[in-house]
Each structure stands twice: as C-alpha cells, then as structure tokens.
Amino acid sequence: EKMALLLGHEEDVSHWTNLVRRDPEHVRLMFDQRWEANGHKDFFMGPKNGMLMTNAFWSMRSKYFPREYAEKMINAWAFNREDGFYGEFFPLAMARQSMSKFTSPPDLAFGYTPDTAYFTLDGMFRQGFAKTASELTLNHLENYNYHKEWDLPVAPEAYRRDLALFGDQYSNFNAGKILLFLEGFAGISYSLPNQTLSVREAMPSAWDWMEFEIPIIKKNGRTKIRVERQNKNGGLNKRIIVENCPFKVKLDFWTEEKKIVSSNSNLYETKSSRPHSIAFESSGISSKPSLTVFLK
C-alpha cells in the first residue's frame, strides 16, 4: 500500500487492502498461530521434522513480531549451549538438539553461516534488546570474522560443525554484517522524504567510543556521529554527538540498564522506542545536536 502511494498508483491501494488483511487482530493471530508450533516450546514456527534453524529469529525483524515472544525465544534458545544456538560461538545455523538427526553433508558443512547470523542479530537489535544484541554481535564477529592463528580478519562462506573453514574465504555473504555496525551498534537510519536522522545507539559496554561518518546529501559532505562512554565520579558518563547533519535529529540513548542520574541536551525529550533508553529530538536543523547522560 505504501509503495503504491509513493509510486503514484493510488488504484493499487484498494487491491492490496482487499487482498491482504492488515488489521492488528489478524496480524497478531498470524504470529500466535505459529508460536510454539509443533510442540517446540518458546520457539517460533518450528517445523514438524524438528529441524530448528535460525530463521525463527529472522522473524523478529518484523516490526509486528510480538516482543514478548522475542524475549522468550532469546532467553530459551540464544544462550542455550546444550540444546540451543550457542555453539563455540553464536549462532549455530541449527539448534544443537536437532544436530544428531540431521547429518547430511550440507548440514555438516554449514555449521555456522554469515548471512543467517546477520538476520538473527539484526532482529535482536530491531526488537530493542540492546545488551543482548551488542554482546552476541561482538561474540560472533570476534570468532567468525577473525582468525586467531593467522591474526587476520577473515570472511568465510561457512564454518563446518567441527569449525573447519568451508567454501569461499572472501564471501560476500558476510557483507550484511557491515549493517550490524551501522544499524545495530549505531542504530543509524534516515529519511530523505521526512528529512530526519535517527540514532538508536547500542554501543557495546566494552567499548569507550565509536564514530561513523555517513553521506546523506552530497553538497553537505559527511555527517559525523560519535558515541563516547567514560567511567567518572563512581558512575558512567555517556554522550552522543552529531555534526554536520542537514536534517532534524532524534537521539535514542541506551542506558545500559543503569539508573539515570542526570541528562543534558540541546534537544527536547521525547518517547523512546525501547526499554532502558531515553530519547531526545530537535524541532529543526541543529548545528551540533548532542546528548550527555550520567548513569549509576
């Protein structure tokens, strides 16, 4: 419907409205009917044959996916080293409980895969689980995309279940993980039609800072986004700074599940889109919007 309107095909709107039900009750029903399907507890859309794969987590990328289901599935399966998807690192392509049954050559070859990891982790960021998503993303990148013996970055097509490298060692299937930095850790999104920039940061707690420069409008040059954290006065001082942004700005700040002692910003406070966060936005274009928060 939105695409039809944007492209000027208003007559298509009624076509899609009649073809696909979009009322909230029906959308929720579609998720409820697939939750714990075929007896798989705290799992989404599990198949009859018992082959539990990460595509259950991919569904969390939908803005309609129930957050309470996402939380249950993450707690039950993401950190589960016995039956779930946490192997030598996160995520296994197939749940451990399914591995004894599915042992074909492809099953053994694709023990850990890059694109499935991206879809899985992206869903966690989108659902607002900043702590879990950032920790598991670091775990994946450090183990999948860095070879300790060679002391080099790598981008393999897959790791076998026994952790041997498989396939192309320069695989573009890894390219999606760039978005785990841009859209995950930094939470950057912008709209040219609405002229807005949003930063919903989830910087790993192990990092002191991160900085991004992104092209938005060519004539303006790059927009710089920086997040800093510093232990100070028995607490944590955290800051977001945006420079050279041609749009209105919204900053959604992750409190790392700590108590907010004070905040200082040249923006206006607004509603945050996730738990353990505080958000501010500008009423217009600001030369250097920023947000500083002291946490304990």
Over which residues does each language-model region extend?
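Well-ordered alpha-helical scaffold segments within catalytic/enzyme domains
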Residues: 1-10, 57-69, 118-130, 180-189
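Extended, compositionally biased low-complexity polar/Lys-Gly-rich tracts
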Residues: 3, 42-43, 236-238
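Extended, well-ordered alpha-helical scaffold segments
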Residues: 3-29, 67-82, 128-143, 193-202
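Short amphipathic alpha-helical segments at helix-loop
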Residues: 5-8, 105, 162
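Residues at structural and domain junctions
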Residues: 13, 45, 106, 119-120, ...
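Extended glycan-interaction surfaces of carbohydrate-active proteins
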Residues: 18-112, 145-159, 220
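Non-catalytic C-terminal accessory modules of carbohydrate-active enzymes
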Residues: 119, 123-296
